[in-house]
């Protein structure tokens, strides 16, 4: 697996919809990514309001750079250098507490899967991240079953050959409680985890080396803080949607709103005084 973040790892392509209306918008977008470590190339298509970024950075970091120009940006798809789409998925994490996040999966090659995401509301430090057996949230995260482990192995670290297939190690939250990470895994496959769940834990995963009775079972990483079902998502150019057919919101109106529930219908801006 690669590092939590930075410019290491396999290059992938991020497809963003960006609000652009003129050539100065294009110039500002290009300038925002120019010379950034981990960004190899940028394609800006004004007519389609589309920006393609070839990068090794987490999508959240690229999106923040784009939105630093004062323009909204929405990630619409991810892809690898492969000619065919090998599969992509996403998990929206939530729970009874304040922890929430988005984690994406992209099958880079038949042997290598990219996992990247952003999780907020954590205590600073390391937190175990695991794929679990079931996509069942009827009892919050407690009904998701054990770590995904079709091989009957003991719990271990992501670089161990003998480990649960769902053992993704730890992600680190900063002083503000945010974890931004990008990692690659040679055991996990997108097609094996769709319909299962992803869980972020309260504490550090000891990677099976801690000597605690739970070390070889869960990594002794504590309570389950937040979870989400892993669902199939769009690869490159597979998401042409500009308006949601379910409620008529544009992709710009959706930005910053929940994907479901009462909060989705409430405007993020106060009504105009007419």
UniProtKB/Swiss-Prot annotation:
Binds 2 copper ions per subunit. Cu cation 2 binds at residues 244, 246. Ubiquitinion by XIAP/BIRC4 leads to enhancement of its chaperone activity toward its physiologic target, SOD1, rather than proteasomal degradation. XIAP/BIRC4 preferentially ubiquitinates at Lys-241. Residues 88-234 are annotated as: Superoxide dismutase-like. Keywords: Chaperone, Copper, Cytoplasm, Disulfide bond, Isopeptide bond, Metal-binding, Phosphoprotein, Ubl conjugation, Zinc. The modification Phosphoserine is found at residue 267. It is found in: Cytoplasm. Disulfide bonds join 141-227. There is a cross-link at residues 76, 189, 216, 241 (Glycyl lysine isopeptide (Lys-Gly) (interchain with G-Cter in ubiquitin)). Residues 11-74 form the HMA domain. Its main location: cytoplasm. The keyword Zinc applies. GO terms for molecular function: cadherin binding; copper ion binding; protein-disulfide reductase activity; superoxide dismutase copper chaperone activity. InterPro entries: HMA_dom, HMA_dom_sf, SOD-like_Cu/Zn_dom_sf, SOD_Cu/Zn_/chaperone, SOD_Cu/Zn_BS, SOD_Cu_Zn_dom. CDD domains: Cu-Zn_Superoxide_Dismutase, HMA. Homodimer, and heterodimer with SOD1. Interacts with COMMD1. Interacts with XIAP/BIRC4. Interacts with SLC31A1(via C-terminal domain); this interaction is Cu(1+)-mediated. The heterodimer CCS:SOD1 interacts with SLC31A1; this heterotrimer is Cu(1+)-mediated and its maintenance is regulated through SOD1 activation. In the C-terminal section; belongs to the Cu-Zn superoxide dismutase family. Delivers copper to copper zinc superoxide dismutase (SOD1). This is Copper chaperone for superoxide dismutase. It comes from Homo sapiens. The lineage of its organism: Eukaryota, Metazoa, Chordata, Craniata, Vertebrata. The gene is CCS.
């Amino acid at each position: 697996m690669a590092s939590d973040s930075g410019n290491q790892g396999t290059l992938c392509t991020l497809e963003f919809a960006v609000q652009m209306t003129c050539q100065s918008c294009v110039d500002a977008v290009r300038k925002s990514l120019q010379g950034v470590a981990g960004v190899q190339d940028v394609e800006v298509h004004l007519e389609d309001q589309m920006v393609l970024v070839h990068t090794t950075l987490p999508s959240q970091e690229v999106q923040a750079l784009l939105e630093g120009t004062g323009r909204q940006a929405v990630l619409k798809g991810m892809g690898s250098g492969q000619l065919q789409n090998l599969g992509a998925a996403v998990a929206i994490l939530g729970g009874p507490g304040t922890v929430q996040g988005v984690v994406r999966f992209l099958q880079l090659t038949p042997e290598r899967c990219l996992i990247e995401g952003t999780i907020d509301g954590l205590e600073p430090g390391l937190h175990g991240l695991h794929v679990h057996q079931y996509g069942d949230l009827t009892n919050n995260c407690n009904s998701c079953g054990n770590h995904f482990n079709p091989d009957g192995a003991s719990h271990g670290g992501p670089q161990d050959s003998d480990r649960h297939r769902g053992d993704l190690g730890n992600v680190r939250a900063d002083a503000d409680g945010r974890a931004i990470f990008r990692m690659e895994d040679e055991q996990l496959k997108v097609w094996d985890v769709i319909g299962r769940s992803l869980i972020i834990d309260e504490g550090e995963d000891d990677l099976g080396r801690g000597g605690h009775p739970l070390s070889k079972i869960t990594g002794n990483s504590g309570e389950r803080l937040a979870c989400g079902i892993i669902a199939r998502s769009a690869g490159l150019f597979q998401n042409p949607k500009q308006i949601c057919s379910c409620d008529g919101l544009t992709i710009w109106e959706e930005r910053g709103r929940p994907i479901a529930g009462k909060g989705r219908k409430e405007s993020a801006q106060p009504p105009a005084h007419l």
